[in-house]
């Protein structure tokens, strides 16, 4: 089970991948709590229902007891690309390992599905996201007009080392993620 950072939310901190049946309720829970994750930024457009309906099995949530501490909305494509649409940690839980637990869980699942690379994007003004992704080993490339004219973004990219018996013999290189492979990720709450 994905256990990680010490939480002050009244219970053990665990990471789970929601089921599609849980998607609509989780989507509503996230939308209702957006200010507690994103402050005054309007990020509703990042949270379309498809991320927790059709792609629920690739999403990750971290809870401390019944409190949602963080979530990651992502997908692993047939072309072996893992993409992170949104990752967020509740403001009071930042700096306690929740974001890393979200990524560890997602990347281990993506790796098990054969993903070779993961990508994510943010706005150039989001210095916290840029620093966080760099600490995880991502490269960060500014891309002019990435999201349309006048909408520049920073594209994060990270090579994933494959799962397998020989993995332990090879140290991860720059731009690769050294997370521990796991296949025991729980489904649902």
Regions found by a protein language model. Give the residues of each.
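Conserved GNAT acetyl-CoA-binding A-motif
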Residues: 110-122
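Short secondary-structure boundary/hinge segments and terminal tails
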Residues: 106, 111, 128, 150-152
């Amino acid at each position: 089970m994905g256990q990680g950072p010490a939480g002050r939310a009244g219970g053990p901190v665990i990471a789970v991948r929601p089921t599609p049946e849980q998607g609509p309720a989780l989507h509503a829970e996230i939308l209702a709590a957006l200010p507690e994750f994103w402050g005054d930024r309007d990020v509703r457009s990042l949270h379309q229902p498809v991320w927790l309906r059709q792609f629920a099995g690739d999403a990750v949530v971290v809870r401390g007891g019944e409190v949602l501490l963080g979530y990651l909305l992502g997908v692993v494509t047939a072309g072996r690309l893992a993409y992170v649409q949104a990752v967020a940690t509740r403001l009071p839980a930042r700096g306690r390992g929740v974001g890393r637990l979200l990524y560890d869980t997602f990347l281990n699942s993506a790796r098990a599905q054969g993903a070779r690379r993961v990508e994510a994007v943010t706005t150039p003004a989001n210095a916290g996201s840029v620093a966080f992704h760099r600490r995880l080993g991502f490269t960060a490339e500014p891309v002019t007009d990435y999201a349309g004219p006048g909408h520049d973004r920073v594209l994060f990219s990270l090579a994933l080392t494959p799962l397998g018996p020989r993995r332990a013999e090879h140290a991860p290189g720059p731009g690769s993620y050294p997370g521990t492979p796991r296949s025991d990720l729980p489904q649902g709450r």
